[in-house]
């Protein structure tokens, strides 16, 4: 299970090369190379779960509006994770290794501190069918399922854990 992730809310114009490189180093490189190095230890029935994000699939409804984060580089890193999941699942499936991801929406963590403002919380809740901010346990429960025998026929998937965002 790889849960590498940092975020930087910034417009396209405001991102620096350093921001971009740091996001990709943390969000893409840091899960890629440990998995590569550990592959010899993975046998049939092993599972790899990466953490993607709702940001890889949707854009904010009103970019630039107060409370709406702009995350183009972060979203690109999480899109890269979703691509890795598909490629790794195809390559490692022959060895009986499953590879999946979870794609959390807004989860109450330090990374979603924008929800601490009324505007940010309103933005987050406006996207979700279930009308609450997700909890870390919501994501952990899906990860536990993905590594269980109950998910033995699932590989190459990215499971949204987002309260029905953008339905």
Residue positions per predicted region:
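Catalytic Tyr-X3-Lys loop
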Residues: 6, 13-33, 49, 74, ...
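Substrate-binding pocket helix/loop in short-chain dehydrogenase/reductase
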Residues: 11-12, 16-24, 62, 70, ...
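Amphipathic alpha-helical dimer-interface segment in Rossmann-like NAD(P)H-dependent oxidoreductases
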Residues: 26-46, 56, 89-90, 94, ...
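Active-site helix of classical SDR
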Residues: 35, 77, 85
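Residue(s) in the substrate-gating loop at a strand-loop-helix junction
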Residues: 53
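C-terminal helical subdomain
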Residues: 82-83, 101, 123-154, 163
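Short, small/polar-rich loop/turn modules that mediate ligand/substrate recognition or access, typified
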Residues: 93, 98, 154-156
